[in-house]
């Protein structure tokens, strides 16, 4: 399986993502610069964390207009996996692949720590190797990770089982309904604020994030068998 790691000016978690895929997962991964216009040959797209374009205007607002983004939209429309982490999640909301928005943390401070997450939906291509309601531990590092949406959108997310991860015990940023990660209605686009790529080795604190990437590979292999 081959992963594309999209690089924007200001990305700083792209190396972590590449390492997670190549070294911990044992799959192929390549950087794709934001000015490129093709994702041909890739099976999954990863939008990493960081501060794309310096977070000017607002997080993800300028990345929305990068040359690669129309291709990311087309890629998602084919049903292939798209994962946006932290700034990547913010970008996914900006381009309309996911509903809602990410705003300033309610304490107005940058947060960097490992937090407990509850797997609300274990029946997605991203969570197939987790149990429903399992509590895992994954790092967060953000200043604008407070997920917001209106009441109608929140109701729709709940009805469609689109909420995949919630913060457990303590909500670190004020997100509505403790939301940490959501998928689109089709289930092939996941945005999450916590960093699974930083939880892939015991030596750096745990491997709870590795199963997310393993789940993607498992779903892809099953699709190849059934094709």
Curated annotation (Swiss-Prot):
Organism superkingdom: Bacteria
Entry keyword S-adenosyl-L-methionine: no
Keywords: ATP-binding, Cytoplasm, Glutamine amidotransferase, Hydrolase, Ligase, Nucleotide-binding, Purine biosynthesis
GO molecular-function term, one example from the UniProt record: ATP binding
Reactions this protein catalyses: N(2)-formyl-N(1)-(5-phospho-beta-D-ribosyl)glycinamide + L-glutamine + ATP + H2O = 2-formamido-N(1)-(5-O-phospho-beta-D-ribosyl)acetamidine + L-glutamate + ADP + phosphate + H(+); L-glutamine + H2O = L-glutamate + NH4(+)
Domain Glutamine amidotransferase type-1: 2-226
Transmembrane regions: none
Pathway where this protein functions: Purine metabolism; IMP biosynthesis via de novo pathway; 5-amino-1-(5-phospho-D-ribosyl)imidazole from N(2)-formyl-N(1)-(5-phospho-D-ribosyl)glycinamide: step 1/2
InterPro entries for the chain: Class_I_gatase-like, PRibForGlyAmidine_synth_PurQ
Database matches in Pfam families: GATase_5
HAMAP family assigned to the protein according to its UniProt record, in alphabetical order: PurQ
Quaternary structure note: Part of the FGAM synthase complex composed of 1 PurL, 1 PurQ and 2 PurS subunits.
Function: Part of the phosphoribosylformylglycinamidine synthase complex involved in the purines biosynthetic pathway. Catalyzes the ATP-dependent conversion of formylglycinamide ribonucleotide (FGAR) and glutamine to yield formylglycinamidine ribonucleotide (FGAM) and glutamate. The FGAM synthase complex is composed of three subunits. PurQ produces an ammonia molecule by converting glutamine to glutamate. PurL transfers the ammonia molecule to FGAR to form FGAM in an ATP-dependent manner.
Protein name per Swiss-Prot or TrEMBL: Phosphoribosylformylglycinamidine synthase subunit PurQ
Organism of derivation: Listeria welshimeri serovar 6b (strain ATCC 35897 / DSM 20650 / CCUG 15529 / CIP 8149 / NCTC 11857 / SLCC 5334 / V8)
Gene name as annotated: purQ
């Amino acid at each position: 399986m081959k992963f594309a790691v999209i690089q924007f000016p200001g990305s700083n978690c792209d190396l972590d993502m590449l390492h997670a895929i190549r070294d911990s997962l044992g799959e192929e991964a390549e950087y794709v610069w934001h000015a490129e216009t093709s994702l041909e040959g890739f099976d999954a797209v990863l939008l990493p964390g960081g501060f794309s374009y310096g977070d000017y205007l607002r997080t993800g607002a300028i990345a929305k207009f990068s040359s690669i983004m129309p291709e990311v939209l087309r890629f998602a429309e084919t049903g292939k996996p798209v994962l946006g982490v932290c700034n990547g999640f913010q970008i996914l909301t900006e381009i309309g692949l996911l509903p809602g928005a990410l705003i300033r943390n309610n304490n107005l401070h940058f947060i960097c720590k490992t937090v407990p997450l509850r797997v609300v939906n274990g029946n997605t291509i991203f969570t197939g190797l987790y149990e429903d309601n399992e509590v895992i531990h994954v790092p967060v590092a953000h200043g604008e990770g407070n997920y917001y949406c209106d009441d109608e959108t929140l109701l729709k997310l709940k009805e469609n089982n689109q909420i995949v991860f919630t913060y457990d015990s303590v909500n670190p940023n004020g997100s509505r309904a403790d939301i940490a990660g959501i998928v689109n209605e089709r289930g092939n686009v996941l945005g999450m604020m916590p960093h699974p790529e930083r939880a892939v080795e015991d030596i750096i604190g745990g491997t709870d994030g590795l199963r997310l990437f393993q789940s993607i590979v498992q779903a892809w292999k099953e699709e190849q068998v059934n094709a």
